[in-house]
A protein has these predicted regions:
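N-terminal glycine-rich FAD/FM-binding segment characteristic of electron-transfer flavoproteins
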Residues: 1-172
């Protein structure tokens, strides 16, 4: 386990986060970098893609599964009407979908073993610092809520369908 810890990372944007991760990854040997599809990057789904770009590696977004096949990695993505299977050479970066892996409940021996694993912690200075952000966040706002009538029609009866169509026409 490797981690970079610094209070300056609390407000890092996707580019800054990816830059720090890429710098840390350059310090170690790896075959595969697995990222979530989005989280602290305001769910913009950019960090994994940026890490791959900064490292010059193949990167696949929205991955459902990854498995080793000889010297290659087989990466599956569920598209609208099909499953896409890509063969890529490691090292590579993948961003997994949130439903790709169901979390399991660890057994006590797994928890105890995890506590004994080595953890390498670096400061920002040890990985080259944090770059200036090319983006300035002016504000983050939620969309304005719209008052709705809240009409619920139960069942697909001819009467309900007629009422729905009449309601739509009346609101125009």
């Amino acid at each position: 386990l490797y981690r970079v810890v610094d209070p300056a990372l609390e407000d890092a944007d996707a580019f800054q986060t990816a830059s720090v991760l890429a710098a840390a990854l350059r310090k170690i040997d790896f075959d595969l970098v697995v990222c979530g599809e989005g989280s602290a990057d305001r769910y913009s789904q950019q960090v994994g893609l940026l890490v791959g770009a900064l490292l010059g590696l193949p990167v696949v977004n929205a991955t459902g599964s990854v498995r080793a096949e000889g010297d290659a990695l087989l990466v599956e993505r569920v598209l609208e009407n099909e499953v896409e299977v890509l063969e890529i050479a490691p090292p590579a970066v993948v961003s997994m979908t949130s439903d790709a892996v169901l979390p399991r409940i660890p057994q006590l021996k797994d928890i105890l073993a995890a506590g004994k694993k080595p953890v390498t912690t670096w400061s920002l200075d040890e990985v080259g610092g944090i770059p200036e952000s090319p983006v300035e966040t002016v504000s983050v706002k939620a969309p304005a809520s719209i008052a709705r009538k809240g009409i619920v029609l139960e069942g697909a009866t001819d009467e309900n369908i007629g009422e729905l169509v009449s309601g739509i026409r009346a609101s125009r």
